[in-house]
Amino acid sequence: HYQIILKKNIPNCISNSFFISISDINDEKLSRDGYSITISTHSKAIFWEGLTKDEYEAKKEFTQNFIIKEFLNNFDNIKQENIKTLFSATSKTFYRYINRTNCGGKPITAKTIFQLPSCNTPFYGLYNVGDTVFAGQGWPGVAIGVNVLNKELNANS
């Protein structure tokens, strides 16, 4: 995992950094045809609302191209021609898949840095995992959310 911190904010985003997760080459699911690389950053959900389809696609493509250019500037061994499949998503994409426009989770602050969020729900056998529990980016956010659940389920073992 890497985090690239830039001098200026990413266009159409509220951050000057992006987080990179790279699959393990031995991962038969994610790396079957080469490495899988996920890049994530922060953007306000409301920014993507009220745009025409053309405006939306243009802004999304502009942001994607900016991030890819900065990504390639930081990795000498990866070239544009190495990218076989490329797509980007916004809060509208997020909504289409999980019916939420924003990430969930409890933000980490100076007061909460040593507190693990709860994965419990009021329903027996139903737990929250992933970014619902830990508001992290990419695979680390998912993994930490699952780790919280694992500790909860095995606490009395």
Where are these regions (language model features)?
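Short, glycine-/Ser/Thr-/acidic-enriched flexible segments
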Residues: S23-D27, H42-I46, V133-F134
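Short helix/loop capping segments that flank catalytic or ligand/cofactor-binding pockets
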Residues: E28-L30, W48-E49, G136-G138, E152
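Flavin-binding catalytic cores
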Residues: P11-C13, E55-K92
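Conserved FAD/dinucleotide-binding core of flavoprotein oxidoreductases
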Residues: S31-E70
